[in-house]
Amino acid sequence: MIDHRRWDVMQGKKIRKAAIIAALCLCILCPWARAEEIADRTSNSQLDQGFVGLYNLDFTGAQKDFAAWEKEHPDDPVGPVSEAAGLLFSEFNRLGVLEAQFYENDKAFFGRPKLAPDPALRASFQADIDHAETLARARLARDADDRDALFALTLCSGLQADYAALIEKKNLASLHFTKEASASGRQLLEVCPDCYDALLATGFSKYIIGSMSAPVRWVLALGGLPADKQGGIADLQITAERGHYLAPFARILLSIAYVREKDRIRALQLLNALHDQFPENTLFPREIARLQSAH
């Protein structure tokens, strides 16, 4: 006879893990606009420079660039939400959340040492989120299809999902924010099908949830988080090839997916290319060395 109470506890633990991993995929860097419009509007802008800084782990420089963008575009919610992304990304780096093996190995992830979050950073992060949401909702009141506003709300929810799951370990709250971010991302894709960066919001989530056991996939699907392992990889590949701000991050997530799929060669190819593109990011050489030493 099945011990239903024990089964419920086991499935609850798996769902909590899925909540955390799903939050990770919403990630930190998500200004999605049409690729050709981005090239015309923001090439070499402070916003571009800021995200390059984040990929190079230059958080101080990135924050200066984001602040400069916000000063010149005070009504644009992308400014404050990018600042929030920079703050959270720096905290993740300090806490060790950005290590790829945590995605690959649940035991390593859940067994990592706990570090106290920075309360001052937390307050600044929430203030930037609140400011971005206020600006975004004001723009959506004027134009329900405003792409920058939809992006800002998507990223606000995604960042809060990440903080709740990975720092506060509030997994149910993280699932709530994850669903909000996915819904905003889908709405953006409806009005802008070639906003390729938006595919990352759902791509890694579909891949991770598609890798879970059937009962967990079923429960999460009821909660609005679909599972499609191969479709998720396809979405990531499109963002990696045709995205703008998120193309490098899609390559990072693809390399993680390849590690999980035991495709070491393709994972190393992506990580080596990322290391060449962002030489100041110490994560890439560490992960390259780890993969090479494992075989």
Where are these regions (language model features)?
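Short coil/linker segments at helix-helix boundaries
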Residues: 37-46, 53-66, 75, 86-145, ...
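A cross-kingdom marker for long, charged
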Residues: 256-295
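Sec/Tat signal peptide C-region and signal peptidase I cleavage site
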Residues: 31-35
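Bacterial N-terminal signal peptides that target proteins for export
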Residues: 8-21
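N-terminal carbohydrate-binding/catalytic regions of secreted carbohydrate-active enzymes
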Residues: 82
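Bacterial N-terminal signal peptides
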Residues: 19-30
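Intrinsic-disorder-associated, low-complexity terminal segments enriched in Asp/Asn/His/Tyr and depleted
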Residues: 3-4
